Structures are given as structure tokens and as C-alpha cells.
Amino acid sequence: MRRHASRFRTSPIYLNYRKGETMTDSPNTTSAINPVEQFDMYVAHVGINASNADEAEKIANLFTALMGLPTIEQPPSFFAGTLVEVMKQNGRGTKGHIGFHVNNIPAAEKYFAGRGFEIDETSRRLNPDGSTFLVYFKDEIAGFAIHLTMDK
């Protein structure tokens, strides 16, 4: 199931990329490659900061009632399904955070580094095999911390 809607372009460059040919992209050019298409990127969830566990549970339960999804408790947060994460004690970001799912974190990190977005290495979370399943960017955008995530 696709969780986002992409606009498919029909330019020759895009078609060549889709056929598996290697293509380069620089921060100063517009090309058919974008992270949504290249990394099957979509919004995994929105994070909301609560001041304590009771408030977090109440907020998550409201989203659960709104969307008919289960409330799932994790050590740092409550989830309403997989769409909304409510942090128990003021998580990252002034206003909260946005998690973007990608299919290849190392490649996505390289892509975004080429555009001047730095990774906060202290935020990196690893799978037992040593691969990354979550990492934040250093800077917020409009008060939101941004992280990349992959399936564990």
C-alpha cells in the first residue's frame, strides 16, 4: 500500500533513471530525481510533545478516538496507530517532530548531506545488526525536529 502520492514525470531524464541508469543531481539543479521517488519517502508519523505521561496518554487517546486506531504505549511515547506519536516528556523539536520513512537511510543521509542538511549523530538508533533505523537532522524546520526512519 502506498502511503503517499507521487507525481510521475515523463521527461527523458526521469525515464532513463527509472530504467536503472545512474544519474547525478546537485543541490543547485532541478532534476527528476527527488527524495520522495528515490527513497520511497513518506511521512511515517507526526510527533507531539506532551509535558508528562498522563498528558501524552490523553492526547494519544483523542487521536485514537478521532481515527479509530489503537493506542500503543512505548517507553518514551504513546502512538495512535502509527500516524501520531505523543512524547511523554517533551521530545525533540520546539513544536514536535516529523518522521519520514525512507527505504535506505545511508543513501538518504548522503543525498541530504549534499544539500547541506547535517545529521545529529547523537540521535542515531541502531538495529542489532548495526544498521540505522532512526536518525535526526541537526536543525529544526519551523520548530519541528525531522528524522529519517526505516523498518527495523
Locate predicted features.
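Mid-chain, well-packed structural core segment of small domains
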Residues: 94-122
